[in-house]
């Protein structure tokens, strides 16, 4: 019951936040005559793997409905699962991701231009065929590096960073990756440790650019990975 009440409260808070953002967008930016070209509102969601980015993204989708376009940053990974390059880089390293390509795509979508991009399938670790992406009034980019490049930060109108306490992050990541991605708990824990330095180097510093930081922390003790 407490969890349901917390979820309802969070949804209400999110709805109010979006209402304020939309009012600013509609009556501020879009009504300003100096903006000769209509631009769409870009929302960024950043944070480490397993912090709850997709959950927040789905909450935004529930609030905004078909006015929202979802873009997930994993589509910019340079290689599919099993490629030898993943022995040299982690997914958190910007050099292992086409972040400049992502920035160009976000810029195009903001300016109401159609793009073509692939998505990353976490079940089989492969990229989809190129898909035609038609921009919408609200666009959310969710991923590991949304605020890494200065030119992309300029294009994102509202930046949300999710800062989840580490024990909860590990718990959520284990539940997700064992259930939906076919990994063993041992493999997940090895992955977490191997990526920790890159998380500290490339992901955590993006928090300073956020307009809003969402923090999740435990209020009760729990066993990590136990459903």
Specify the residue positions occupied by each region the protein language model found.
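NTP-dependent small-molecule kinase module
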Residues: 2-36, 134, 175, 179, ...
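Short hydrophobic/aromatic beta-strand immediately N-terminal to the Walker A/P-loop
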Residues: 43-44
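The conserved Walker
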Residues: 49
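Conserved lysine of the Walker
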Residues: 53
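Hydrophobic positions on the alpha1 helix immediately C-terminal to the Walker A/P-loop
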Residues: 56, 60
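Post-Walker A helix-loop "phosphate-sensing" segment adjacent to the P-loop in P-loop NTPases
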Residues: 62-71
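Conserved nucleotide-sensing/catalytic segment adjacent to the nucleotide-binding pocket
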Residues: 69-70, 78-125, 138
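ATP-dependent NMP and nucleoside kinases share a basic, alpha-helical "lid"
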Residues: 128-181
């Amino acid at each position: 019951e407490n969890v349901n009440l917390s979820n309802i409260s969070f949804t209400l808070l999110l709805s109010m936040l979006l209402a304020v953002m939309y009012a600013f967008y509609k009556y501020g930016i879009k009504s300003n005559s100096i903006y000769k070209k209509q631009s769409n509102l870009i929302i960024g969601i950043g944070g480490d793997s397993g912090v709850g980015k997709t959950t927040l993204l789905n909450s935004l989708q529930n609030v905004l409905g078909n006015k929202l376009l979802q873009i997930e940053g994993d589509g910019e990974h340079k290689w599919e699962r099993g490629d030898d390059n993943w022995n040299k880089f982690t997914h958190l390293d910007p050099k292992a991701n086409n972040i400049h390509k992502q920035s160009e795509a976000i810029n195009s979508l903001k300016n109401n231009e159609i793009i073509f991009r692939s998505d990353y399938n976490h079940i089989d670790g492969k990229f989809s065929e190129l898909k035609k992406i038609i921009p919408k009034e609200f666009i959310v980019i969710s991923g590991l590096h949304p605020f890494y490049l200065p030119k992309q930060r300029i294009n994102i109108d509202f930046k949300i960073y999710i800062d989840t306490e580490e024990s909860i992050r590990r718990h959520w990541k284990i539940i997700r990756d064992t259930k939906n991605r076919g990994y063993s708990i041992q493999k997940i824990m090895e992955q977490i440790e191997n990526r920790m330095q890159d998380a500290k180097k490339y992901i955590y510093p993006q928090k300073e650019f956020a307009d809003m930081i969402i923090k999740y922390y435990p209020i009760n003790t729990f066993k990590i990975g136990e459903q």
